Amino acid sequence: MLELPGARACAGALAGALLLLLFVLVVRQLLRQRRPAGFPPGPPRLPFVGNICSLALSADLPHVYMRKQSRVYGEIFSLDLGGISTVVLNGYDVVKECLVHQSEIFADRPCLPLFMKMTKMGGLLNSRYGRGWIDHRRLAVNSFHYFGSGQKSFESKILEETWSLIDAIETYKGGPFDLKQLITNAVSNITNLILFGERFTYEDTDFQHMIELFSENVELAASAPVFLYNAFPWIGILPFGKHQRLFRNADVVYDFLSRLIEKAAVNRKPHLPHHFVDAYLDEMDQGQNDPLSTFSKENLIFSVGELIIAGTETTTNVLRWAILFMALYPNIQGQVHKEIDLIVGHNRRPSWEYKCKMPYTEAVLHEVLRFCNIVPLGIFHATSEDAVVRGYSIPKGTTVITNLYSVHFDEKYWKDPDMFYPERFLDSNGYFTKKEALIPFSLGRRHCLGEQLARMEMFLFFTSLLQQFHLHFPHELVPNLKPRLGMTLQPQPYLICAERR
C-alpha cells in the first residue's frame, strides 16, 4: 500500500507540534518550580511532582512531616506541591505574626484547581479575599448571632437536641455501639436550625447520606491523588480516580442542598428572615441592581454546604475524641463526673452559665482541642500581595499552610505536649486559665466564624452525656488511637458502652 508524501508530511508536522507542545509544558513546569529569590528554604524536590511524593510516602501524617521539616529548615519553610509554591508556617509566634500582624495580606485563598472546580472560588470558606467574601462573612456572622448563639432561647434548642441524643443512646441499653452517626446527626441539627429553621430526624436517611458524602470528601480532599489534580488539573479528563469520586459526591450534595433550600424558602416573608436561607435571599433581592453583588443562588448553595460541613465535621470529631479519652482515662472521667454532680447535680440540665463554675470540665475540653488537632493544617491561605516575614520574601499568590499542630505541640508554650494532661489549663488554685497558644479556631480575619456556637455545643453535649452516662470500651478493647487522615483528623471507628449512672 502506497503512503502519500503529503500524509507523511502531515504526520511529521503533527509529531513536531506535539513535541514542541511537550517541550513548552516541561519548560513551563520547571519554571514554576524555581524557588524565587529570598523565598524560604525547603527540602529537595523532584522534577514535576516536587515534594508531593515525599509527603505521600512519608510514614508520618502530613502535619507531623511538616513539623519535622521545620526543625531542619526553620519555622518558615517552603514546599513544592507539583509547581504550586507553598510556604508552611510552624509555631505560634510565626503563625500569629502572619495571621494577626499581617492579617489582610494573609487573608486570601489560593486559586487551586480543586477549589475552582468545586466552588468556582465562590461561597464563603474558599472565596477570595475581597468584597464578595466580606459580604458573605458579614451575613454569616450576623445569622449565627441572630438565629443561633446570640439568642438565649437557642441554648434550650441545643439542650433539646442533647436529650434526643441521650434517648437514642439509651436504646443500646449499655451495650457496645458506634456513636459517630448519632453525634453527627445531633451536631448537624444545631447548624440546620440556623440555616433552615428546622432539624432532621435521626431516621432521615437522605440527610444522613449527604453528611456521609461530605465526610468522605473531607478525607478525599487530603489524598495524594487530589494533590496531584491540583498540580496537574489535566488529569481531570481521566474517568477514574479519587478526584472523580470527590466530584461525583459534590454533584449529589449540590442537588440535595438545592432542594433543601427551595423547601426552606417556601414560607419566606421578604425582610422578615427566620433563618440563614431567608436572610441570604433578602440579600439577593437587594443586590439585583448591584453589578458587584456576589449574592446568587449558586453561592447560596456553596455557602450552605460549607457551613454544614464546617459546623458538623469539626464539633462532631471533638466530641468523638473527648468521649474516647474519657473511656481511655477513667480517672479523668471520674473527676468530670464529680464536678458535674457538684455543680449541676442529677436532676437539673447542664447550662452554659455553669461553664465558669466547672474549671476541670473546661480544662478537659480545651486539652482535647489541643491534643487532637481536629483541623491540623487549617484551611489553606494565600498572600494577597507581596509579603516579607522574618527576612523571607513571599510573593503575591503564594499558597500558605498554617501548621496548627506545630502550634499546639510547641515546646515553647506547652510542657510535655505529647501528654494528655488537662491540668495544664488550671492554675495553682484550680481555676481555669486560658492559653494564648491554643488556637483551634485559627486567628486573624479568616478565623472560624462559628467559634462561639461550637464552644457552646461542645460544653452542653459533653456535660449532658457525662451527667447521664459512664463510658467505657467493651471488654476493655482500646481502639486504635492513630487518627484517620483527611482535612480533619477524626478517630478510627470505635465501639463504646454508655451505662446509665
Swiss-Prot record:
Disulfide topology: none
Signal sequence residues: none
Superkingdom as given in the UniProt entry: Eukaryota
UniProt: substrate binding residues: 250
Tissue and organ distribution: Highly expressed in the liver and testis.
GO biological process: response to cesium ion; response to ionizing radiation; vitamin D metabolic process
InterPro entries in the cross-refs: Cyt_P450, Cyt_P450_CS, Cyt_P450_E_grp-I, Cyt_P450_sf, Cytochrome_P450_fam2
Main location: endoplasmic reticulum
Function: A cytochrome P450 monooxygenase involved in activation of vitamin D precursors. Can metabolize vitamin D analogs/prodrugs 1alpha-hydroxyvitamin D(2) (doxercalciferol) and 1alpha-hydroxyvitamin D(3) (alfacalcidol) forming 25-hydroxy derivatives. Mechanistically, uses molecular oxygen inserting one oxygen atom into a substrate, and reducing the second into a water molecule, with two electrons provided by NADPH via cytochrome P450 reductase (CPR; NADPH-ferrihemoprotein reductase).
Sequence similarity: Belongs to the cytochrome P450 family.
Subunit relationships: Homodimer.
Protein name: Vitamin D 25-hydroxylase
Protein species of origin: Mus musculus (Mouse)
Annotated gene: Cyp2r1
